[in-house]
Structures are given as structure tokens and as C-alpha cells.
Amino acid sequence: MDNQGVIYSDLNLPPNPKRQQRKPKGNKSSILATEQEITYAELNLQKASQDFQENDKTYHCKDLPSAPEKLIVGILGIICLILMASVVTIVVIPSTLIQRHNNSSLNTRTQKARHCGHCPEEWITYSNSCYYIGKERRTWEESLLACTSKNSGLLSIDNEEEMKFLSIISPSSWIGVFRNSSHHPWVTINGLAFKHEIKDSDNAELNCAVLQVNGLKSAQCGSSIIYHCKHKL
């Protein structure tokens, strides 16, 4: 539209007053007048073109942001980055802590389940109890200490059914029953009276009990016999 306006103004330039006063004198005068008009039109066209370029430069310069505006834009950009970093910190860190807490709680529950509801590896389960079936031969006192180190006790008998089950697993093993002498009753390692019958109890040197296939028998406490451990769930 601006170019059209410039061309329009050039085409409608007012005639030169000097040229209006002059009267054409023949062909030579007409040619001179025409040349003057062309020269005048070219000068006006160049001037209009220069004005248009200057206006265009001024228009573009107005669109460019000034130094204070650039500073404000930079500050706003920094503030936005800080806010985004804060949001990420607020969202990510708590979720990470919650996940770690959940994992820790899960591990704790798993450990409790293994301790309370399941037997350790290489142990067998029977009637809510865990049993360690040993292969080493030790004295009664050494067997007692070995089971204590495993957070359990030397094998104990609660009923006849359990006795039959254990006698099938092992032909002979120490149990947690003893007496101070042949004149004292048989007691468990917890100090409770033992109710089941033990054979050969008249021998004064046999003050520790052994589980065998055919029942319970007394034996010398210093003998080397296989031991088993028991841990109740």
C-alpha cells in the first residue's frame, strides 16, 4: 500500500510554475520541457524512496526491545527457572523419601515374617515349630550351647505325637532333659518337670536324656551324640 501511495504521488506531481509560464516554441522546446519533467519526476521518486526507507527503518527500530526491557525479560526468565526448580524439589524429594520409607517398612515386615512365620533355611517345620537337624556329634552341654547360638533350644518333647515324628527323622539325638543325680527328678532346661518315661534311669552316671527309635533313654552327659535344636514359631 505504501509503494502504491508513492507512485500515486509521483504521477500527480504539480506542474513546474516556470514551465506553465513558458509557451512551447516548436519541437525543440517541447523536447526540453519533456526532459525537465522526467528529471523532476525522477528526483521526486528518489526522495520518496528515501523517505520510505527511513520510515521502514524507524518502524523496525520501534519493534526492537530496549535495554531495560531485555533486563526485565532476563530477570523474569531466571525467576521462572527458580520456580520450576523449587516445584521439582518439592515434588520429587518427598516422593523419594516416601518410597524409601515404604521399602524400609516392607523389608522390616519381611524380616518379621521370616522370623515369626517361616523357618530359617535348612530347618524343617512341624506343628508350629522349627527344627534344626544336626549332623555333628557333641556332648550334652556342647549341644545345648550350639542350639543357644542358633537362637533356639536343645530338642524338647511336648507330646507323644511329636516324639514319634522326631524319632523317625533321627534314630538318636540329645533332648533338653537332665537331672542332677539319680535321686533327683528329670527336668527340662527351663526347670519344668519332665512327664514322659525315661528308661535306664536307675544308673547314677546316666543323667542326660536321649531320644531313640524305641523311646527315651538315659545316657552319660559327656557322650558324643547327634543333637537337634527346636524353635517355636
UniProtKB/Swiss-Prot annotation:
One Pfam family it belongs to: Lectin_C
PROSITE patterns recorded: C_TYPE_LECTIN_2
Domain of life per record: Eukaryota
UniProt domain C-type lectin: residue ranges: 118-231
Sites bearing Phosphotyrosine, chain numbering: Y8, Y40
Motif (Immunoreceptor tyrosine-based inhibition motif (ITIM)): 6-11, 38-43
Annotated region described as Disordered, given as residue ranges: 1-30
Gene coding for it: KLRC1
Extracellular side stretches: 94-233
Function field: Immune inhibitory receptor involved in self-nonself discrimination. In complex with KLRD1 on cytotoxic and regulatory lymphocyte subsets, recognizes non-classical major histocompatibility (MHC) class Ib molecule MHC-E loaded with self-peptides derived from the signal sequence of classical MHC class Ia molecules. Enables cytotoxic cells to monitor the expression of MHC class I molecules in healthy cells and to tolerate self.
Official protein name in the record: NKG2-A/NKG2-B type II integral membrane protein
UniProt entry keywords in alphabetical sequence: Adaptive immunity, Cell membrane, Disulfide bond, Glycoprotein, Immunity, Innate immunity, Lectin, Membrane, Phosphoprotein, Receptor, Signal-anchor, Transmembrane, Transmembrane helix
S-S pairs: C119-C130, C147-C229, C208-C221
Residues exposed to the Cytoplasmic side: 1-70
Biological process per Gene Ontology, one example term: natural killer cell inhibitory signaling pathway
Molecular function terms, GO-annotated: carbohydrate binding; HLA-E specific inhibitory MHC class Ib receptor activity; MHC class I protein complex binding; transmembrane signaling receptor activity
Native species: Pan troglodytes
Assembly mode: Heterodimer with KLRD1; disulfide-linked. KLRD1-KLRC1 heterodimer interacts with peptide-bound MHC-E-B2M heterotrimeric complex. Competes with KLRC2 for its interaction with MHC-E. Interacts (via ITIM) with INPP5D/SHIP-1 and INPPL1/SHIP-2 (via SH2 domain).
